[in-house]
């Protein structure tokens, strides 16, 4: 080992690097249980149909998933590798933010771990979906903003611009983070950067990166705005936004880190030593307020807390350094006890570690409803395959499978070929634009609809089974619209029916 490598390994930055590698590795080791989540199945399905945009989200996540498919096939752990690595990056950048905010090595390690154990971060490190990478870009923007404020080097606007461009190519809610940044710049001395060519170059860079999806939106009449409005109205109607404030304490952040990020926010806003970083506190509060006023989902704010955790850890270690030895020991002992307990609780409740139907599973699945949506997809496809196998041979050439939601569609797309299943169609999101095929279907296996809905489109519908899974786990597939039907004799030409068969999910 050369002296330069040895110095890096033992340096403060090296410690953060190895810690980030360890965090990513832990995700990789724990990501192999159960199966794909419904959201992952949708991403993988679109990864097999690459485009510069999709109804529900921008294209970057499907592009990353396509790389995973090329490298690892449909491996659960392989496809989730990129999400795990993303959380390693989040740990590393959070530690570096603590450094730039004045934190020593213990503060940097503390901040990195505190960011890692947030429930939304643990979920982001588990699933190959847009939230995983959106999280990275939020933290990346925060990191470059901290560097900008610390060094007064306007060239960091280029890094901010890259983060914004990549973020807008991943998830549209990044616009709230950008709005928070703009408000913070306008309300603080950072507005001096408005005269800097580097800021406008960064803005141009962001627009250049986002341009492919922007052009796609123009070509498709901004269908994603229509989708977002519909989904937002649905979320409000279903009460998904009513717990925005309490979920800041146990979804967006780990409750055991509450003292840390609160201290960080107070330090940024009010401490004389934090005056240079006032913009960070305002950036956070503006983003939080905008999302609350727009009745957004609580977890959208999650990555914004990383910079506050970094500030809180830096302040805590600085405060303890000036105290008596006994007080330092008590303070650090208490802080690390909270972090260790929070880590254990967070990992057990959020990561897919509990054996299905064990007593631990019963607890974790009640707390974290996402895990039940990782169970039963291959069983569903096998049931559909059994129905298809029983059809008369003369019907099979003109048979399609109509899927009610993107999870069912994604499962049929991923696993259907192994069973020799026919074409899958759906009116969900981007699938509607891919049409019903040619020639027109004559026999349709209907999955994920109530009988009455199927009857409204077909004169003949026969009950063919009910969705179950081998574990008896109750999830959306086994609780709602569980009937499987074989339908024939469309009531209208397919071209007319298809106009009314579009839905957003």
Segments predicted by a language model, with ranges:
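Short hydrophobic alpha-helices at membrane interfaces in multi-pass membrane enzymes
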Residues: 144-165, 196, 200, 204, ...
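Membrane-proximal, lumen/periplasm-facing interface regions of secretory-pathway glyco-
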Residues: 328-397, 407-410, 414-420, 427-429, ...
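Membrane-interface transmembrane helices that cradle and orient dolichyl/undecaprenyl
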Residues: 99-102, 141-157, 266-272
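Transmembrane-lumen/periplasm boundary regions of multi-pass, lipid-linked membrane glycan transferases
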Residues: 175-277, 347-352
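Transmembrane-helix motifs of polytopic, lipid-linked glycan transferases
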Residues: 81-102, 140, 144
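Transmembrane-helix signature of polytopic, membrane-embedded enzymes
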Residues: 4-5, 9, 13-18, 94-117, ...
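Short acidic/glycine- and proline-prone juxtamembrane loop motifs at membrane-interface regions
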Residues: 120, 126-134
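Short helix- or helix-capping micro-motifs
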Residues: 20, 111-119, 164, 168, ...
């Amino acid at each position: 080992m050369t002296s330069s490598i040895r110095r890096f390994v033992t340096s403060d930055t090296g410690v953060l690097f190895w810690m980030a590698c360890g965090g990513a590795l832990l995700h990789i080791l724990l990501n192999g249980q159960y199966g794909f989540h419904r959201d992952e199945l949708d991403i993988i399905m679109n990864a097999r149909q690459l485009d510069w945009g999709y109804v529900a989200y921008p294209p970057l996540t499907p592009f990353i998933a396509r790389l995973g498919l090329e490298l690892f096939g449909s491996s659960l752990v392989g496809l989730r590798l990129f999400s795990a690595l993303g959380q390693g990056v989040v740990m590393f950048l959070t530690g570096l933010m603590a450094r730039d905010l004045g934190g020593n090595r213990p503060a940097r390690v503390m901040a990195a771990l505190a960011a890692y154990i947030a429930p939304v971060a643990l979920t982001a490190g588990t699933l190959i979906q847009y939230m995983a990478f959106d999280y990275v870009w939020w933290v990346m923007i925060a990191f470059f903003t901290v560097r900008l404020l610390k060094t007064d080097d306007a060239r960091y606007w280029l890094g901010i611009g890259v983060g914004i461009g990549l973020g807008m190519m991943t998830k549209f809610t990044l616009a709230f983070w950008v709005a928070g940044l703009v408000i913070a710049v306008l309300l603080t001395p950072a507005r001096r950067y408005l005269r800097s060519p580097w800021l406008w170059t960064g803005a141009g860079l962001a627009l250049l990166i986002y341009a492919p999806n922007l052009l796609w939106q123009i070509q498709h009449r901004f269908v994603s705005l229509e989708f977002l409005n519909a989904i937002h109205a649905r979320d409000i109607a279903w009460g998904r936004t009513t717990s925005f404030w309490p979920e800041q304490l146990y979804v967006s952040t780990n409750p055991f880190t509450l003292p840390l990020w609160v201290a960080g926010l107070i330090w940024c806003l009010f401490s004389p030593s934090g005056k240079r970083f006032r913009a960070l506190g305002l950036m956070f509060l503006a983003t939080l307020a905008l999302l609350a006023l727009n009745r957004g989902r609580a977890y959208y704010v999650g990555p914004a807390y990383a910079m506050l955790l970094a500030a809180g850890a830096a302040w805590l270690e600085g405060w303890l350094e000036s105290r008596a030895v006994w007080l330092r020991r008590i303070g650090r002992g208490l802080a690390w006890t909270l972090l260790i307990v929070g880590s254990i609780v967070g990992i057990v409740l959020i990561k897919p570690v509990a054996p299905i139907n064990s007593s631990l599973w019963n607890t974790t699945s009640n707390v974290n409803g996402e895990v039940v949506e990782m169970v039963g997809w291959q069983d569903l496809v096998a049931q559909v395959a059994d129905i298809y196998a029983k059809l008369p041979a003369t019907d099979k050439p003109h048979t399609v499978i109509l899927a009610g939601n993107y999870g069912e569609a994604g499962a049929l797309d991923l696993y259907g070929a192994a069973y020799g299943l026919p074409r899958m169609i759906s009116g969900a999101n981007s699938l509607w634009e891919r049409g019903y095929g040619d020639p027109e279907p004559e026999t349709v296996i209907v999955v994920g609809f109530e009988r009455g809905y199927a009857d409204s489109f077909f004169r003949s519908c026969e009950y063919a089974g009910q969705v179950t899974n081998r574990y008896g786990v109750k999830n959306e597939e086994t609780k709602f619209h569980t009937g499987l039907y074989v339908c024939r004799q469309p009531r209208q030409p397919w071209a007319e029916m298809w106009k009314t068969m579009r839905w957003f999910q």
